[in-house]
């Protein structure tokens, strides 16, 4: 059974999962990894979830305020051996529910063209592709997405 726990970026399980995420992205992004890494710092993220299978941390994600009503989904990751089991969807839906509780009405995110499984997850969860925002404007390998959040 999967349990999703709310925490913050000081959580050691979250930090360990993010280390694995960064290793994966370093391979996928190649030379562009340094650009993306600059926007993926976790020190000040107050809203983090970690998914556990029994006592094993298997996935994570975070939300970060983008504007008064908009949150940004950050640091989504599931261990490879646990993918395809609904964990990423559970993490995402928990983050969205938390965002609604905090008063946000919209969610945005950036993922990479080299992450087709992430793009499929977000599309399946109701996200639509939007023009690249903020620091991702003009970045060829970025895919930005958005979803209206409802209670």
For the regions a protein language model found, what residue spans apply to each?
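Short coil/turn segments at alpha/beta junctions that flank glycine-rich nucleotide-binding fingerprints
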Residues: 69, 85, 101-105
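Alpha-helical interaction/dimerization surfaces of two-component signaling modules
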Residues: 17, 21-24, 98, 121, ...
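Conserved phosphate-binding and hydrolysis motifs of nucleotide-dependent enzymes
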Residues: 55, 59, 86-88, 126
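C-terminal "cap" of GNAT-fold acetyltransferases
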Residues: 7-10, 105-108, 112-125, 131-151
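Conserved acetyl-CoA-binding loop-helix of GNAT-fold acetyltransferases
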Residues: 78, 84-97, 124
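Acetyl-CoA-dependent GNAT
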Residues: 2-74, 79-80, 92-93, 132-135, ...
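Conserved GNAT acetyl-CoA-binding A-motif
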Residues: 92, 99-110
């Amino acid at each position: 059974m999967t349990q999703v726990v709310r925490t913050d970026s000081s959580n050691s399980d979250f930090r360990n999962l993010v280390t694995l995420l960064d290793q994966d992205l370093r391979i996928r992004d190649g030379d562009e990894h340094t650009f993306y890494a600059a926007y993926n710092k976790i020190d000040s993220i107050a809203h983090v979830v970690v998914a556990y299978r029994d006592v094993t941390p298997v996935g994570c994600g975070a939300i970060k305020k983008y504007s008064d009503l908009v949150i940004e989904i950050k640091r989504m990751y599931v261990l490879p051996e646990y993918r395809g089991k609904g964990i990423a969807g559970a993490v995402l839906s928990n983050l969205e529910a938390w965002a609604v509780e905090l008063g946000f009405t919209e969610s945005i995110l950036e993922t990479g063209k080299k992450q087709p499984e992430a793009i499929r997850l977000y599309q399946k969860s109701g996200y639509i592709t939007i023009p690249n925002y903020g620091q991702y404007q003009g970045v060829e390998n970025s895919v930005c997405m958005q979803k209206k959040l409802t209670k």
